Amino acid sequence: MTKFIFVTGGVVSSLGKGIAAASIAAILESRGLNVTMLKLDPYINVDPGTMSPFQHGEVFVTDDGAETDLDLGHYERFIDSTMTRRNSFSTGQVYENVIAKERRGDYLGGTVQVIPHITDEIKRRIHEGAAGYDVAIVEIGGTVGDIESLPFLEAIRQMRSQLGRNNTLFAHLSYVPYIAAAGEIKTKPTQHTVKEMLSIGLQPDILICRMDRTMPADERRKIALFCNVEERAIVGSYDVDSIYECPEMLHDQGIDNIITEQLQLNVQQADLTAWKKIVHAIQNPKHTVKIAMVGKYVDLTESYKSLIEALKHAGIHTETDVQITFVDSESIEKNNGDVSMLKDMDAILVPGGFGSRGVEGKIAAVRYARENNVPYLGICLGMQIALIEYARDVAGLKGANSTEFDLKCAAPVVALIDEWQTADGSVETRDESADLGGTMRLGAQEVELKAGSLAAKIYGSEHIRERHRHRYEVNNNYVPTLEQAGLVIGGVSAGRERLVETIELPNHPWFFACQFHPEFTSNPRKGHPLFTAFVKAALNNKKA
């Protein structure tokens, strides 16, 4: 049967539960176990798809089209398992399903309550997501003590009672601050968060202590005594330069031995050779490139988490220190298109996004890259922006724009597609008045690349599969005009619509843009061919 590891957090949020959980998963996977991961989000939103990036950060898209928490991106980068919509659910989804059952009469007129109906639905979803795996690591979002988390914590308490200690393990992440004025490490916050857990029936088996320095032996003994946890199960999670150092850091403290003993897992020794190579490559680069990322969410870089990591992965596989400079597209717009800050950059990237704010600043950045032969990579909106700039400045389509920004523009080269065929053959429709949630082209889609194109050379294939998240498409009515002006359509969707998927410029050192999100499938072990090619282009531009 599947063994469960439940990861919770206390004291404050943003301690790195996702990284800790993913690191444990990576270690267990290296010991030969088939591991999956789940993220349980206590918010009432159905999913993060319509949440502001400033509040929630990046929305990570799975292969099957689920819009999920960015932690699922960490999961896929740390382990080989591919996440699906079963690996993530929220309070909103739980209540939505329970209420739907009540409306259908599934509860036979009974009073629907948090216990047992909500907790039963949570447990059902956990078991569904974990089915078929040796170990499932379940991260509970939020902080112990938050009212929103209580049904989830009660559900995992019940699972411990039902499955037993040898099939479940509680790992609790706590903050252990260092007070500089006193010159002391303080364990009281950890004592209080464990007390909070005990009050709801949860006893941590492992305490992972987030610290900015190594934990002294006496403090470890103190935490073990007051929190009723074995001393060897008090594990330090220290600040590191790269998150990819975390698996080795936790393994060196024996966390996997504690887990395998309690869960009675008879497995091989851990082999972290691959992780050691990754860390060595990060710490010993031979080259340096500077890449400008021009967007509107630059004040919260978590909005571009997978993209940042994908560039780092490309750095690993090209022995390059990729230095990212975030450029606010609104500031370019407000300064009459001043792009002087881009002159020292080796390459320019415009990522995805929504809304009209900062668009003209992004267009100015694309124009600079095209006219000055600077390597350019556009992703999702970044492709649409590149196409709008080309339509205006090269193809002569005055008033070219997207209907997302100007519904009555003279040349809608990017528009809302109202009907398309999904990967399973069904037809979906949408219009301008449709709800924002659930009206996007989502998940992995087949893409056909033109023989001899830059796209085909980068991927080494004419058939690829990449993940999407967008509502607006290139208007195919304008494609002939754009192609006559020299634009190359390097890739189109495999469906009957033949939607534009990639564009490139033949008379430019390296100019490529795609409608899909390749960053969602990059990982440190393999990287991604598109980002590797982009970093190589930046290196070539630097040498030139």
UniProtKB/Swiss-Prot annotation:
Keywords: ATP-binding, Glutamine amidotransferase, Ligase, Magnesium, Metal-binding, Nucleotide-binding, Pyrimidine biosynthesis. Signal peptide: none annotated. Mg(2+) binds at residues 71, 139. One of its GO terms (molecular function) is glutaminase activity. ATP binds at residues 14-19, 71. The active site is at 380 (nucleophile), 517, 519. Pathway: Pyrimidine metabolism; CTP biosynthesis via de novo pathway; CTP from UDP: step 2/2. It catalyses: UTP + L-glutamine + ATP + H2O = CTP + L-glutamate + ADP + phosphate + 2 H(+); L-glutamine + H2O = L-glutamate + NH4(+); UTP + NH4(+) + ATP = CTP + ADP + phosphate + 2 H(+). CTPSs have evolved a hybrid strategy for distinguishing between UTP and CTP. The overlapping regions of the product feedback inhibitory and substrate sites recognize a common feature in both compounds, the triphosphate moiety. To differentiate isosteric substrate and product pyrimidine rings, an additional pocket far from the expected kinase/ligase catalytic site, specifically recognizes the cytosine and ribose portions of the product inhibitor. This is CTP synthase. It comes from Neisseria meningitidis serogroup C / serotype 2a (strain ATCC 700532 / DSM 15464 / FAM18).
